[in-house]
Amino acid sequence: MLTAGGPEGCNEAVMSNRDSTLTTPRAAAVAGILFSLLLMASLALIRTSLPADPRDAAGWRSVDVSRVALALQLVPFAGIAFLWFVGVLRDRLGAKEDKFFATVFFGSGLLFLAMLFNSAAVAGGVIRLYGMAADRLVESGVYAFGRVVTYEVMNVYTMKMAGVFMISTCTLSLRTGIFPRWMAFLGFALAVFLLLSLGLVAWAPFVFPLWVLLISSHILKANLGRGRA
């Protein structure tokens, strides 16, 4: 039974529901920038704090544990920001999202994040043990094992998933135009580099966050420009 307001009341309710629909903030692309900066800071701290050779006992004894611990503490926050970045990309795709490539895009992003956390957890465990019995741990070879496992997971498997994420994202971009074509082709080239690098290039992990930084900066600029229009 309709109230005195009748159809007018129903229309007002419908309009109210439309107005309350959640929308992505225009500044949400900051999440990708935050991810890039946090991950690059973490990688730089680790690279400059640990000896290049895991068998170098003297180098391990001079490790600045506090710097490495800080680097590892940044990783979870980088991961949270990356999830927001994925959400921003999906929001820009909207109804044009291709189910096949979107599945690869989303799955590779989650696998990248899982392996990033895994490598950070292994490194964190080794560093924690180092704080309890440094000399015994270095001599036992546990440090070398932990370092090699962390290196393999981060530089081989994590980077492969980053490459797949880049390829699927750039393919979606070429189909939908969410960012310029030259950025997509650059992403393809960088993704191939990550897939073929086989962990042989020490600074290769920086490629992915730099690419995310480029894409996020473009999206943020486009969103803010649209907001001022």
Predicted regions and their residues:
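Short, Lys/Arg-enriched N-terminal segments with co-localized hydrophobic residues
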Residues: 3-14
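Exposed boundary/loop context
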Residues: 1-5, 22-25
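Hydrophobic, aromatic-enriched alpha-helical segments typical of multi-pass transmembrane helices
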Residues: 14-229
